[in-house]
Amino acid sequence: MIETIISSLAIRNHRFNPAAIERDLFDSFGSQRYVHLAFIVSSKTNELLSYSCNCKDGLLPYKRSLHAEDQALSILINKLVKKKMEFKNIRSGINVISLRITRNNEIKLALPCMRCYKRMMRNKNLINSVLWSDDDGNIISYKLTEMDIEKLKIRDSSGVRNRYQ
């Protein structure tokens, strides 16, 4: 399934084994009905630079999770800091792709939450576009600086909304 997604998005993938990505994805399911998956790709070459799945952090009493977009950005930044990747790979910017995949392999709505949107805005000099899946499996694309949080109905994640319940 991951190979199909990567090829349909025309992502060049020389760094990661699709079977390993798929294993990470399905290991993340646990008791969840779906998993969010985020890819970070080079705007210039469309090369896959980083990816991540959401996961429960288990550190807090409420059900907080590490969001895939946030984690994929952190992985990319860590690679740059530790010099495991050269800055020239992202000089022309990156695109963030967010997908939600159900246990039945359906692609559903994966609009980034408010927290992830704010994190991306703090890195707007690096991020060119944000792409996400809608409930029909289509990919929606916006330049980060042109995203309208009111029009797109970007809101807090369920973990933030349910924090004190």
Task: Go through the PLM ranges and name each one.
Residues 1-165:
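Zinc-dependent deaminase catalytic domain
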